[in-house]
């Protein structure tokens, strides 16, 4: 299996998995044009589309792709049923694509119906988990998002986190504002800054490393707890997550 990223809009990534036979899976095609160009350039045969949630920058290209390749099966949560989804999937169900079984994980928060797809080592997490951050809460609550990213953080160490946006640099600037002396965060920030200066992608990331540099995954970390306690005493990891999300919204 080969993992490919296709840039779209200002900072989106459309992920494509292809096998040796050229069959491919497309994840969150917000725009059809760059996907069609990549399909033509690589001689891929699209087999399926995965949708994580209903936002236009993730579903906008579905209808054009299905029109061009009517054999495509479009998997998605209930909230994408009017966006071209032909196979609605929900938590704990599986999608069998390219000879691999993908587990569906419900991750409400960014939207109420948001889902992720996992087949070792690939995690397609849409706008739930970003490198160094997590998605904004357009529909869900901090409690829901905390539980969602906790699920994702429990996946195997070698999981490849395939986020849908290039937000890593801004996320790491926020992380530094919270834990300015953290060695892992500082090292990763420098690496990301160099990559972005060359207009290079920072994704995917390895989950084991992400747990070290993503403050939203470190709500039980004593260094973070001490920082938060300087401002307010919060007893539960869930409360500390909500504090971080509120700070990030205003950053």
UniProtKB/Swiss-Prot annotation:
EC number: 3.1.2.6
Record flagged with keyword Hydrolase: yes
Pathway(s) per entry: Secondary metabolite metabolism; methylglyoxal degradation; (R)-lactate from methylglyoxal: step 2/2
Known catalytic reactions: an S-(2-hydroxyacyl)glutathione + H2O = a 2-hydroxy carboxylate + glutathione + H(+)
S-S bridge residues: none
A molecular function (GO) term: hydroxyacylglutathione hydrolase activity
Co-factor requirement: Zn(2+)
Top enzyme class: hydrolase
One GO-annotated biological process of the protein: methylglyoxal catabolic process to D-lactate via S-lactoyl-glutathione
Highest taxon listed in the record's lineage: Bacteria
Residues where Zn(2+) 1 binds: 53, 55, 110, 127
tRNA processing is among the record's keywords: no
Keywords annotated in UniProt: Hydrolase, Metal-binding, Zinc
Binding site for Zn(2+) 2: 57-58, 127, 165
UniProt cofactor note: Binds 2 Zn(2+) ions per subunit.
Subunit structure: Monomer.
Protein family: Belongs to the metallo-beta-lactamase superfamily. Glyoxalase II family.
NCBIfam families reported in the protein's UniProt record: GSH_gloB, PRK10241.1
Function: Thiolesterase that catalyzes the hydrolysis of S-D-lactoyl-glutathione to form glutathione and D-lactic acid.
Protein name: Hydroxyacylglutathione hydrolase
Species the sequence originates in: Escherichia coli O6:H1 (strain CFT073 / ATCC 700928 / UPEC)
Phylogenetic placement of the source organism: Bacteria, Pseudomonadati, Pseudomonadota, Gammaproteobacteria, Enterobacterales
């Amino acid at each position: 299996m080969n993992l490919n990223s296709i840039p779209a809009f200002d900072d989106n990534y459309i992920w494509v998995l292809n096998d040796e036979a050229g069959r491919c899976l497309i994840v969150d095609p917000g725009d059809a044009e760059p996907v069609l160009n990549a399909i033509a350039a690589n001689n891929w045969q699209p087999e399926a589309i995965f949708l994580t949630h209903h936002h236009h920058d993730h579903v906008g290209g579905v209808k054009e792709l299905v029109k061009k390749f009517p054999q495509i099966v479009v998997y998605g949560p209930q909230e994408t049923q009017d966006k071209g989804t032909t196979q609605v999937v929900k938590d704990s169900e599986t999608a069998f694509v390219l000879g691999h079984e993908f587990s569906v994980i419900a991750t409400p928060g960014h939207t109420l119906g948001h889902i992720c797809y996992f087949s070792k080592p690939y995690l397609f997490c849409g706008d739930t988990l970003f490198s160094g951050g997590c998605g904004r809460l357009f529909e869900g609550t901090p409690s829901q998002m905390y539980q969602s990213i906790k699920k994702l953080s429990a996946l195997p160490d070698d999981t490849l986190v395939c986020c849908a946006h290039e937000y890593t640099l801004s996320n790491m600037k926020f992380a530094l504002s919270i834990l300015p002396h953290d060695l892992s965060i500082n090292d990763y920030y420098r690496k990301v800054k160099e990559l972005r200066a060359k207009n290079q992608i920072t994704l995917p990331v390895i989950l084991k490393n992400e747990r070290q540099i993503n403050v939203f995954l470190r709500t039980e970390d004593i260094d973070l707890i001490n920082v938060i306690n300087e401002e307010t005493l919060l007893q539960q990891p869930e409360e500390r997550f909500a504090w971080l999300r509120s700070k990030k919204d205003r950053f």
